[in-house]
Amino acid sequence: YLNKEIVDEARTFGWDKVVYYEKPLLKKTRQLYAGQYGVALDSKEMPQHHLNQFGIKIDAFVKHHDSHAAAGYYTSGFKDAVILTVDAIGEWETVSISKGYNQKAIERMESIRYPNSLGILYSAFTQRCGLKPAEEEYILMGMAAYGTPKYKDNIYNDFVERKPFRLKRN
């Protein structure tokens, strides 16, 4: 989480509003659905709790994938763009496709929702290889360049329904 040095540096740039990168209550609905009751019901996991110690008030919340899309699009220099966001999970979305218009607006076109997540599948393979999920995926990615895809069809057949994209449940 945040520390004093990071907050002090951010304050040197100034700000008009503090916008948080996900909608915590929407995220908690997904955590409850997934059976993560301890985290979902813990008020210390609410973002404002972490910011109170720095005297910072959150002015607005945006969906996690919208914040990824905005960060990529508004810093890209493109007037119009198609924006692909893929990560383990936002509140519910795991993959989203959006359109950016005239550097003024972003519209969500399609999304894939939890529990269907390429990112979570990738983290599971990371853990299966003895690495730390949500931290060491880059090691697995680097090792992949030296392997051969001899188990690719088995992985697809065992874990993935292709149309529409879904992860098989066990």
Provide a role label for each language-model segment.
Residues 1-170:
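Short acidic/glycine-rich loops and adjacent helix/strand connectors
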